[in-house]
């Protein structure tokens, strides 16, 4: 009370009815709003001896001593034990009819979200204000930068926003939402706004090229549950452990497997040791594809093996050849970059080649992107995920802050992501004024 004599206080909140009723006559609601903060639905409010859940049945009583109710977000959009959203309650609509504002609490970027949000905290905030049914009047968040940007930039975003950089390249389709390299993952990546749909090419024993994110079927399929485990082998040049590799099974056998939720680096090995030419197989598919005749369609061919890219370059200059640097680097010699520019049109590097990290925090930015740009090589960065555990703490557990740091901070040309929808939203209308 003493502080209110010297400072303007906009809100005073309390979980106790007695406290709010004792001060309601001392404040002008036009300058200071009283907020009843709800705790868990089964917890007891000490003044009325009712649970907070039962208090919601008497909103007119609350209106006598408060102008706002602050409720956990689960009061509005409950989440089931399966971590999927349940139908919304009528709380916001009912409270507005009673003349009360509604603030939602318990928002944090580094907590588990309902699967409906694809681990994107912005989607969660928008669910509370842009759902076609109701809109809360405010949110209480541990990471205020995220709702601030979401409401300012993405609220009521149309279907045809202005498109700018970066180029959005999927990682095994929308593999954050569906098992990678499946029709569902690719269809969602397209609908989510990806510019380039990736296909990590692996070869079957009968010479059929397939899209699969790993040459080891144990990594991406249910092969361990079937009779093919007798085909387990160890090939140190491919990986340290044992595996069941795609070139050990026919296409017909692989089609019987189920994909699991979870980079083509094997072309040279397949050609030298298995007699399978990825280059020939890919070129054959491209030559037969309608995409190859559509000049407006962009095709990128990626490899971490310079010899493979040189073979593609000798076969056709129609496509963009992308060299993948398959390890994190802090620097690059001009002579090395000059060599790369002889057989590649662009380069893929890892996120830590731009912003090194240590103990989950960022180090100083490298000049790798700047050096590659000096040789007119576009730079694409991999891999971007929405899950907060994949991001350094400097990004506030916000995937948009992370993307922005690479696009505006490091001037990369494209992002490779398991969640194309997030990158598409960022590109459409997102503006983050964050200096790292």
Residue ranges and their predicted role:
Residues 1-436:
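Phosphate-group recognition and catalysis centered on beta-loop-alpha active-site segments
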